[in-house]
């Protein structure tokens, strides 16, 4: 956790410096005025103007800035993830107890090693990701919680403001990779070896949810986080939670872009139907994934 936040703080500082350079032409006339002849109030007004210009620039490109930060985190967390897997392969991990039989989610003990899973089994994750996203968003829409959460409204404006290709690149691919490397690849995996699946899944999901900064996304991501941890547990490969995360995010982006969510908000009966259908399909996918670990593969998969 410390490394994660340190990287973010350092990168935010560097990003602020870069932003000041980019806006230097606009800020120069303000900064290089006759400061000696200024009153304290006039100087404060100048600094407020500088902060406002820098702040508006950051808000305008907030998703891009978050993606740049995510790329930096991918490099750092990727190295840590690789080192963990290397130690794990060398048998240096510290299990809390005996492992569980294949196909069961253990409460304690080692997580099952990575193993080859047919591509068809990843279609179950596709169904789970789409159904969870639709059902969860419909439930949020029916309760109108999103409209009461100003922090969520601001976050939504940032997420869905840029062009759609930029949304796909940032929110659909890069940010999910950085989040999965940290929350599942490091936090979940490390706690998994010491306190078992349920504790590790809850801790990683809770930290994951609180990082989003608003009630709506916190409720959504704590549920998604538990499913992502479960996918990692059952498939034994980092590719599983990453794929599920990308599917869920892409579903949200596509439905927002096409106006599907707006249409559902105007047709509440259909929203209720989709919430029930999504829950049913998601539950079915969950049960089918439960059987994934029971099928032994001929050869192990690579992380």
Q: For the regions a protein language model found, what residue spans apply to each?
A:
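Membrane-embedded alpha-helical segments of multi-pass membrane proteins
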Residues: 67-72, 165, 169, 219-226, ...
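Hydrophobic alpha-helical transmembrane segments
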Residues: 1-2, 122-127, 165-169, 198-203, ...
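Functionally important transmembrane alpha-helices
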Residues: 5-13, 205, 210, 217-270
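Membrane-interface helix/loop boundary segments of multi-pass membrane proteins
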Residues: 178-203, 230-237
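C-terminal membrane module of polytopic membrane proteins
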Residues: 246-303
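Hydrophobic core of alpha-helical transmembrane segments in multi-pass integral membrane proteins
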Residues: 69-81, 128-137, 271-291
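Alpha-helical transmembrane segments in multi-pass membrane proteins
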Residues: 5-87, 120, 124
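Juxtamembrane helix-loop-helix connectors linking adjacent transmembrane helices
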Residues: 22, 26-31, 47-58, 88-97, ...
């Amino acid at each position: 956790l410390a490394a994660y936040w340190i990287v973010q703080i350092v990168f935010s500082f560097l990003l602020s410096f870069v932003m000041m350079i980019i806006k230097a032409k606009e800020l120069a006339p303000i900064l290089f005025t006759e400061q000696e002849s200024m009153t304290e109030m006039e100087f404060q007004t100048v600094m407020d103007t500088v902060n406002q210009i820098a702040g508006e620039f950051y808000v305008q490109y907030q998703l891009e800035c978050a993606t740049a930060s995510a790329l930096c985190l991918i490099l750092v967390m990727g190295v840590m993830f690789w080192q963990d897997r290397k130690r794990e392969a060398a048998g240096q991990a510290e299990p809390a107890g005996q492992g569980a039989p294949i196909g069961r989610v253990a409460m304690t003990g080692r997580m099952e090693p990575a193993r080859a899973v047919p591509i068809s089994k990843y279609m179950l994750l596709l169904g789970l990701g789409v159904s969870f996203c639709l059902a969860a968003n419909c439930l949020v829409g029916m309760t109108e919680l999103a409209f009461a959460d100003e922090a969520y409204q601001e976050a939504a404006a940032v997420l869905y403001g840029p062009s759609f290709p930029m949304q796909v690149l940032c929110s659909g691919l890069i940010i999910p990779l950085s989040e999965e490397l940290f929350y599942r690849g490091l936090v979940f995996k490390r706690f998994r070896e010491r306190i078992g699946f349920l504790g590790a899944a809850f801790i990683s999901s809770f930290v994951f949810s609180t990082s989003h900064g608003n009630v709506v996304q916190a409720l959504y991501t704590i549920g998604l986080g538990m499913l992502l941890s479960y996918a990692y547990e059952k498939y034994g490969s980092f590719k599983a939670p990453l794929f599920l995360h990308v599917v869920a995010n892409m579903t949200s982006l596509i439905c927002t872009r096409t106006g599907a969510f707006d249409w559902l908000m105007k047709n509440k009966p259909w929203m209720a139907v989709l919430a029930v259908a999504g829950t049913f399909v998601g539950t079915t996918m969950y049960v089918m994934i439960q059987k994934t670990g029971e099928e032994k593969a001929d050869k192990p998969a690579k992380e």
